From Swiss-Prot:
Record protein name field: Phenylalanine--tRNA ligase alpha subunit
Species assigned in the record: Paraburkholderia phytofirmans (strain DSM 17436 / LMG 22146 / PsJN)
Cofactor comment text: Binds 2 magnesium ions per tetramer.
Subunit organization: Tetramer of two alpha and two beta subunits.
Chain's gene name: pheS
EC number: 6.1.1.20
Gene3D superfamilies assigned: Bira Bifunctional Protein, Domain 2 (3.30.930.10)
Amino acid sequence: MDLDQIVADAQKAFAEASDVTTLENEKARFLGKSGALTELLKGLGKLDPETRKSEGARINLVKQQVEAALTARRQALADVLLNQRLAAEAIDVTLPGRGTGAGSLHPVMRTWERVEQIFRTIGFDVADGPEIETDWYNFTSLNSPENHPARSMQDTFYVDGKDADGRQLLLRTHTSPMQVRYARTNTPPIKVIVPGRTYRVDSDATHSPMFNQVEGLWIDENISFADLKGVYTDFLKKFFERDDILVRFRPSYFPFTEPSAEIDMLFETGKNAGKWLEISGSGQVHPTVIRNMGLDPDRYIGFAFGSGLERLTMLRYGVQDLRLFFENDLRFLRQFA
């Protein structure tokens, strides 16, 4: 058989193969188990040693040429497929880019930052405190007796373990413990708000086991209930961006203030039109609490208030169900973006 003809036939067959399957079939004709070159190599055993050596060298050279042609065609077909795929996946860089949605603050966090901003403008500092608190700071220091119902496990989340002084740990039920903590490390006059997470065993449309609260405290030598009324009314006007707000202070009871009052606000429009709605608890700081701060209650007096940030957010935006703030429903949250 003419070896040069085998090379020519293989090169032609490979070049005409339009896809990988056809190319592999043509490869079998020349290099397969029954291929032309394979048959020639099998026949070398019938030749005498000298002829076998020379013919074997010629056949191996031809085999290398055929394999080279096969490799070249494989690469050419691979290049064609790659170019086709690149063309199909090509990106037109002149097209406008895809917009990415910008994140935004949660509505309760918007209220949190707004409250901080307003109180900073009237001279209040902003402090933070531990969410895992001792029962002494959470209850005892705030004039809550040992048998107070708020101390029961039906109202408070207790934590296994005690602090270094052997006091029971719990998840704070309000931010009020920071009244005593802050006053013990700062000297009067004390003007501070403490926003933060708090926890109670409660869950319905208007209550959550975890909620955010802001505590306010002003301690000095001549602070009166009139100061409380002025500060909180001014805050509400700025928060709701209205000057015609009507506020009333309704007598109430809290163990850590005396006298105590619920702060109500009259709504004139919207779903709450004509209703007085509770906004905050407040009062003048109880002398026992002043004493636990390390201060002389005969010299220092002050007021405190505690407002729910979710409550303020619901009233500002007209949200009826507190649980919407915690369900992570983007359809709801996007309204505040």
